[in-house]
Swiss-Prot record:
One of its GO terms (biological process) is tRNA modification. The gene is miaA. Belongs to the IPP transferase family. The keyword Oxidoreductase does not apply. It catalyses: adenosine(37) in tRNA + dimethylallyl diphosphate = N(6)-dimethylallyladenosine(37) in tRNA + diphosphate. Residues 32-35 are annotated as: Interaction with substrate tRNA. Gene3D superfamilies: 1.10.20.140, P-loop containing nucleotide triphosphate hydrolases. HAMAP family: IPP_trans (MF_00185). GO terms for molecular function: ATP binding; tRNA dimethylallyltransferase activity. Keywords: ATP-binding, Magnesium, Nucleotide-binding, Transferase, tRNA processing. It is an enzyme of class 2 (transferase). SUPFAM superfamilies: P-loop containing nucleoside triphosphate hydrolases. This is tRNA dimethylallyltransferase.
């Protein structure tokens, strides 16, 4: 018994998941690579909750796989798949529906459809790539990726050095494109699961992103200041979450507040575009109008799908 809710950032996935869970007595499983981190609530749009009997609870709904990882720890697709498997098993064992909600498409695909096994990190190769980036600039690595794997390069921002290096690493270690390894043999998870995609007009979503960013900046600033005071740095995996580097730049005087806000808005819009591209691969989703979400209607569609 599973429902999947997908869509771009700032699209309303969390609210819909909570409303559905309340209607059917279900529990939510977050599919978000950033909300796993403790302390970062505002900047990751993590729903505010409290722990009850060891489980994060939001307005009476158990909300799993959020707020448990230290900022110095890394989390990946394999970690999520293992954690999600255990979580869903325990939810279903209670006779409840697991509502998977989030925008980290790779996590979603890995759990529901499986993915090719990717090679482990090669530290020597990474050191070589890092040296190239230091001497020739980040753009040089992105250019290398564009030549080796244009599909991955189109999805990865040139400034995201970690992801650019990982895609190049995969290509150099396997001789295959990361984009091919991540798509060949991909099951269309919307064919065998009830999958809701929250759809938005591009301009409407862009406006929502801008408004949300402006509203969360003060909270992100306080969170970031608190984490820096605890000894974390911009290189801590958790603080590499979208937007926090710009807040740190503001704290350090490298950006004005308007500059930091503008940059976060741009990065978030780019992220939303990549999410739309990812989820477009699924051909049998129920598309729900983000401006008029109706949990009861979606449950009716779910009931019809199960027949």
């Amino acid at each position: 018994m599973t429902i999947i809710i997908a869509g771009p950032t700032a699209g309303g996935k969390t609210d819909l998941a909570l409303n559905l869970a309340k209607l059917i007595g279900g529990e939510v499983v977050s599919v978000d690579s950033r909300q796993v981190y403790k302390y970062l609530t505002v900047g990751t749009a993590k729903p505010e909750g409290e722990y009850k009997n060891g489980v994060y609870n939001v307005d009476g709904v158990n909300y799993h796989l959020v707020d448990f990882l230290d900022l110095d720890k890394t989390y990946n697709t394999g970690s999520f798949t293992a954690d999600a498997s255990n979580t869903a098993y325990n939810i279903n064992k209670k006779g409840k529906t697991a509502i998977f909600a989030g925008g980290t498409g790779m996590y979603m695909q890995s759990y529901f459809g499986g993915m090719d096994v990717l090679p482990k990190a090669d530290q020597a190769l990474r050191a070589q790539l890092a040296d190239i980036a230091d001497k020739e600039g980040k753009q040089s690595l992105h250019k290398m990726l564009s030549e080796a794997d244009p599909e991955s390069a189109a999805l990865i921002p040139s400034g995201n050095l970690h992801r650019v290096m990982r895609a190049l690493e995969i290509f150099k270690l396997t001789g295959k494109k990361a984009s091919e390894l991540r798509t060949n043999g991909f099951a269309d998870i919307s064919q065998n699961n009830f999958m809701v995609y929250i759809e938005w007009d591009k301009e409407e979503l862009n406006k929502r992103i801008e408004i949300r960013t402006q509203g969360m900046f003060g909270g992100m600033l306080k969170e970031t200041q608190d984490m820096l005071a605890k000894g974390y740095t911009r290189n801590s995996p958790g603080l590499r979450s979208l937007g926090y580097a710009e807040v740190i730049d503001f704290i350090e005087g490298k950006k004005t507040k308007p500059e930091a806000l503008e940059r976060i808005v741009i990065l978030t819009r780019q992220y939303a575009k990549r999410q739309r591209t990812w989820f477009a691969r699924y051909k049998n989703m129920y598309k729900a109008d983000g401006s008029a979400l109706n949990a009861e209607q979606i449950l009716a569609e779910y009931a019809a799908w199960k027949k």
